[in-house]
């Protein structure tokens, strides 16, 4: 079975070298890492909520998440400095490619009322961020075993120098941008 990484090596690199007029393979942008972040609002009051979020993120990513803690106290949200408020995972190497393949082929088309992803979510330096409202779009999550529906943020960090280069890179993988 050919993976997305093999497709990148065989087709995407030559296509982008031609489109961007690069002379070296090393100039072609690539996906550096994928970061998944799940903020959990009620984690300060109930530890079980954070534990369930960690289990969900572990199932989705295939690796153990890092617990994120509050940087400073905010009285309005009833959190203090050092309280656990979420979890995150940084995917690199083969896990990055496996997750990216599952995201494009399986998960994103399962989003309710899906009409494509916004092309305005680039940050100016070639990185793309998207928010997912329901973790149940991933096939690893069993709908009957979750305690509540949670969202997560996905950031795709590339080595592209501009938004245009990053958009060409993601479009080469048939990333479903809105037309």
Swiss-Prot record:
InterPro entries: Ribosomal_uL5, Ribosomal_uL5_bac-type, Ribosomal_uL5_C, Ribosomal_uL5_CS, Ribosomal_uL5_dom_sf, Ribosomal_uL5_N
Molecular function as annotated in GO: rRNA binding; structural constituent of ribosome; tRNA binding
Xref: PROSITE patterns: RIBOSOMAL_L5
Superkingdom of the organism of origin: Bacteria
Coiled-coil regions listed: none
GO terms under cellular component: ribonucleoprotein complex; ribosome
Keywords carried by this UniProt record: Ribonucleoprotein, Ribosomal protein, RNA-binding, rRNA-binding, tRNA-binding
Keyword tRNA-binding: yes
GO biological process, one term: translation
Keyword rRNA-binding among record annotations: yes
Pfam families from the UniProt entry: Ribosomal_L5, Ribosomal_L5_C
Subunit structure: Part of the 50S ribosomal subunit; part of the 5S rRNA/L5/L18/L25 subcomplex. Contacts the 5S rRNA and the P site tRNA. Forms a bridge to the 30S subunit in the 70S ribosome.
Described function: This is one of the proteins that bind and probably mediate the attachment of the 5S RNA into the large ribosomal subunit, where it forms part of the central protuberance. In the 70S ribosome it contacts protein S13 of the 30S subunit (bridge B1b), connecting the 2 subunits; this bridge is implicated in subunit movement. Contacts the P site tRNA; the 5S rRNA and some of its associated proteins might help stabilize positioning of ribosome-bound tRNAs.
Record family assignment: Belongs to the universal ribosomal protein uL5 family.
Protein name: Large ribosomal subunit protein uL5
Source organism: Buchnera aphidicola subsp. Acyrthosiphon pisum (strain APS) (Acyrthosiphon pisum symbiotic bacterium)
């Amino acid at each position: 079975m050919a993976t997305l990484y093999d497709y990148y090596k065989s087709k995407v690199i030559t296509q982008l070298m031609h489109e961007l007029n690069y002379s070296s393979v090393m100039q072609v942008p690539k996906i550096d890492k994928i970061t998944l972040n799940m903020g959990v609002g009620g984690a300060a009051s109930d530890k079980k909520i954070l534990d369930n979020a960690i289990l969900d993120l572990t199932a989705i990513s295939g690796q153990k998440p890092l617990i994120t803690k509050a940087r400073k106290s905010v009285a309005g949200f009833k959190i203090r400095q050092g309280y656990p408020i979420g979890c995150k995972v940084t995917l690199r190497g083969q896990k990055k490619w496996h997750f990216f393949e599952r995201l494009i082929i399986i998960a994103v088309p399962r989003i309710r009322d899906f009409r494509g992803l916004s092309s305005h979510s680039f940050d100016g330096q070639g990185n793309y961020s998207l928010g997912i409202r329901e973790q149940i779009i991933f096939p690893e999550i069993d709908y009957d075993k979750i305690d509540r529906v949670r969202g997560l943020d996905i950031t795709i960090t590339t080595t592209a120098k501009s938004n245009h280069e990053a958009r060409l890179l993601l479009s080469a993988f048939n990333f479903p941008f809105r037309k």
